[in-house]
Amino acid sequence: MGKKKPVLVVMAAGMGSRYGGMKQIDPVDEYGHIIIDFSIYDAVRAGFEKVVFIIKKENEELFREGIGARISKKVEVAYVYQDLNALPDGFSVPDGRVKPWGTGHAVLSCRGVVDGPFAVINADDYYGSHAFAMAYQYLTSEDEQSEDGKYHYMMVGYQIENTLTENGYVSRGICETDTDDYLQDINERTHIEKRGEETAYTEDDGKRSEERR
């Protein structure tokens, strides 16, 4: 049996909560394209033939009409729901919790739909064509497990200065790698911004300390 083709998993369950509504279906250019259109276009060019959207069930109709119906003309599309209550045995939802769980829980929602190599992206981020080309090349050239039984993973990283904006601060996961470019750690910085020609972050809105790199 040949190796299964990579699938693109798109996390979209938190779209409405992060932006106060489904703003990601609003056009970003004069041709009516939305952000996810660019990612799907680049993914298909790289070789991906199937996309799985992780969504909230209550957003399904709006999502299908605004995104899925158009994209399904170019690539196979499937949907899964990120259900707050869909937890492994022994876990329960804390009282008052309404916000979706994180990335791990979102990807867990794909069990039964994704059974081969896959890449995961956010629906509302722009990655660039190189990211999908690198991911697809890796997923089609590497075995899922090595001889010692360990799974293989990869991540596309970006130079921090290329991900900043002139319009305030951003949150980013800062990656630490070893000399062979293997990931060692990720530290979330929630307030990173440009300060002149430098990049700075603070953990307390600048009240006590500031580090630059």
Predicted features and spans:
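Conserved N-terminal catalytic core of the sugar/cofactor nucleotidyltransferase
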Residues: 1-16, 30-120, 127-134, 141, ...
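Conserved catalytic-core motifs of eukaryotic protein kinase domains, centered on the activation segment
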Residues: 21-22
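Conserved beta-strand scaffold positions in the cores of enzyme catalytic domains, especially
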Residues: 25, 77-79, 153-155
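Generic secondary-structure boundary signal with a strong preference for alpha-helix termini
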Residues: 26-28, 32, 114, 136, ...
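Active-site flanking residues adjacent to catalytic metal/cofactor-binding acidic residues
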Residues: 121-124, 158
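Conserved core of the sugar-phosphate nucleotidyltransferase
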Residues: 129-213
